[in-house]
Amino acid sequence: MLVLFETSVGYAIFKVLNEKKLQEVDSLWKEFETPEKANKIVKLKHFEKFQDTAEALAAFTALMEGKINKQLKKVLKKIVKEAHEPLAVADAKLGGVIKEKLNLSCIHSPVVNELMRGIRSQMDGLIPGVEPREMAAMCLGLAHSLSRYRLKFSADKVDTMIVQAISLLDDLDKELNNYIMRCREWYGWHFPELGKIISDNLTYCKCLQKVGDRKNYASAKLSELLPEEVEAEVKAAAEISMGTEVSEEDICNILHLCTQVIEISEYRTQLYEYLQNRMMAIAPNVTVMVGELVGARLIAHAGSLLNLAKHAASTVQILGAEKALFRALKSRRDTPKYGLIYHASLVGQTSPKHKGKISRMLAAKTVLAIRYDAFGEDSSSAMGVENRAKLEARLRTLEDRGIRKISGTGKALAKTEKYEHKSEVKTYDPSGDSTLPTCSKKRKIEQVDKEDEITEKKAKKAKIKVKVEEEEEEKVAEEEETSVKKKKKRGKKKHIKEEPLSEEEPCTSTAIASPEKKKKKKKKRENED
């Protein structure tokens, strides 16, 4: 029987010399107490050594996944097939794969496990040609490599480098700004016109470093640094300059400062390229969405890429504007719409009225990109490119929405609505609460009110008529009494057939009398008088 034994140095295949002693499982460990006893049980038949740690890592990752490495396949075909003996393996899954692909009989049992323990205890004596120090070094290196592989760890994906690089880049910008401002003020006493002619700071320092004193500009060749027109202007200004004379020691110190500025500028460009490469390695999708600098500042502000991935989109949107946020919450005003994400190119190219909306959408897509870069296995930037294209299309639709045709239809014309202030008080209309019809009731009530008004008016008119008729009747009765008394005095006997009015008679009889009868009665009274 053959035994396949894997080590950190290579593959070892042993030949079992005495298979009878394998039957006693409990006492098998006694046979491996010393290297001499172990050599009586097993003997090394073949040893396939690994060339380096990378090869060992590939072999062991294949064994962990239950696969056969190419190197192992060659060894098994060469040695085990020729021997025509069963193969003892430590992993039952690996034995099944070997049996399936190479058609070799494999054994896995408690006896094999005990045999593997014995071989491992006397490995230095059973495998000649391998020093213990080399074995320990290979074992340690393989353990570290295997741990990195299991944890998906990569040295290129350490976001601490990004945090330090962006912090250093900001510090360099501040130092460069201070140095250049000091250099311009310092050399401005000697040649003040040069600062107005050359606006670029790096070119300004290179000119100073090349020329030095103002008197040397007439003979200096600045064609490598400046265009011909600017060079001629500088030389003309140097001849009629209003600056004061300075000593050689002052010029030396100014030139030394210019050298510092140029070196720091070159290092800054190198650091920026390093930051770009790191960002594309660690967070490619975030880099596509917001750019290298904004992405690095977001990671540095959160502390790490994993901490940033735990933030919500609303938090990422205002990350960097904490002072303004707490100030707004304290004074109960509107909170800020954006923080560090404001410096992204998508937000910068948007019109002011759409900046808040675009920053919100960009924050949502950026959070997806951050989580994909932090927890995803794929290191491509395809998702970031796709999401950026969607945001750019959305931005175009927002920008085109405000453009209307001059001779447009009613749809194109904007509807002006009445402005209502927030503090305007609105009353509640309870008419919408009832589900019963209210129109018929209102109409009935209105009709009843109108009828009541008509009846009241008629009653008032009737009362007025009755009063007028009563007054007329009283006048007529008084006139008749006076006429009867006069007739008695004159002795005229006239038979007047009149029925006395009773108090109980209805007063409507006189009211029915026509106006013609009244006229006749008046004429009679006049004749009698």
Swiss-Prot record:
Disulfide bonds: none annotated. There is a cross-link at residues 467, 497 (Glycyl lysine isopeptide (Lys-Gly) (interchain with G-Cter in SUMO)). One of its GO terms (biological process) is rRNA processing. SUPFAM superfamilies: Nop domain. Residues 414-427 have a biased composition (Basic and acidic residues). Sumoylation is essential for high-affinity binding to snoRNAs. Ubiquitous. GO terms for molecular function: ATPase binding; RNA binding; snoRNA binding; TFIID-class transcription factor complex binding. InterPro entries: Nop56/Nop58, NOP58/56_N, Nop_C, Nop_dom, Nop_dom_sf, NOSIC. Residues 282-400 form the Nop domain. Keywords: Isopeptide bond, Nucleus, Phosphoprotein, Ribonucleoprotein, Ribosome biogenesis, Ubl conjugation. Residues 485-495, 517-529 have a biased composition (Basic residues). Required for the biogenesis of box C/D snoRNAs such as U3, U8 and U14 snoRNAs. Part of the small subunit (SSU) processome, first precursor of the small eukaryotic ribosomal subunit. During the assembly of the SSU processome in the nucleolus, many ribosome biogenesis factors, an RNA chaperone and ribosomal proteins associate with the nascent pre-rRNA and work in concert to generate RNA folding, modifications, rearrangements and cleavage as well as targeted degradation of pre-ribosomal RNA by the RNA exosome. Belongs to the NOP5/NOP56 family. This is Nucleolar protein 58. It comes from Homo sapiens. The lineage of its organism: Eukaryota, Metazoa, Chordata, Craniata, Vertebrata.
